[in-house]
Amino acid sequence: MNFKNNNPSYILGVDGGGTKTIARLQHIETRQKWEVRGGAASLTNDYELALKTCESLIEQLLTLSGARKEQIAIVVGLAGAGNKEKSAKLADRLSKNFRCFELCTDAKTSLYGANAGQPVAMISLGTGSVGATLTGNGHSALKGGWGFTVGDEGSGAKLGVLIIQSILSELEANDEIVSLLGKALCDKISGGRDKLIQWSTMARPVDFASIAPLAFELYDECFTAKTVLSQHIKNVETLIDITRGDHHLPVVLLGGLAEPTKPYLNPLVLKLLISPKGNALDGACFLAEQLLYKENKENT
């Protein structure tokens, strides 16, 4: 793609999720990059926080690079951007003065990053979860990703919920915590039964996701951890199956739980996997470059 003109061009990609947000600005010709990180940016969980995080990261990149908004094509991929009302509201706040702007779901940016824009079935396992396919004719489709309250099976947050449910059942059966998983959980939240119940009622998706690693760490030595993780694996395999459907597509796992989850998958599922060529941030930048190319083509 040739973008040479008298006005330097930049692309800006934003990847925002339930735990962290990363933004990258890149000069089209020199390929120089600037990258910054911040907190959560999920429209599902907290609109105001998502807006504040994105605004802050964008301003940081403008300061670091000296670029102006009118020189930039930006694609912002956020968890929860499927909510049309919230998306329109946020786009109205963020899009002003940019050369061109697109707000989409983090599932879309993950999908295009997973296999560098080539056909693929992408499964994102982070604080939340979602599946998506990109076929040879360019058609894309999403599966799952309904958010923590009614979906997100296979995610870090839902694995955390499985841990809590298991330990609460243990308390009911024994009137005390006996498993290694339960004891590790109490150590992590710095309290016993009462604190556990209080924590459970107040916890956000990111909090539930923060305890998910315990199931992996204790899998080999704790039956309760093994039971919980086995259910998580079933949920992930179901999401993979639903996402692929009738498409014979390679599968890419992305997100913070992708690598920890892989060793426990069924061998038949493992044969479907290929290594990712990129991530959601790469996908956002890929889409931003496409957006800039389209804008330039329309204006020539």
PLM regions with names:
Residues N45, A79-K86, L229:
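N-terminal short leaders/motifs
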Residues A81-I177:
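Phosphate-binding/catalytic loop of phosphoryl-transfer enzymes
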Residues M1-I72, R93, G113-A121, I164-T300:
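ATP-binding/phosphotransfer module of carbohydrate and carboxylate kinases, centering on a glycine-rich
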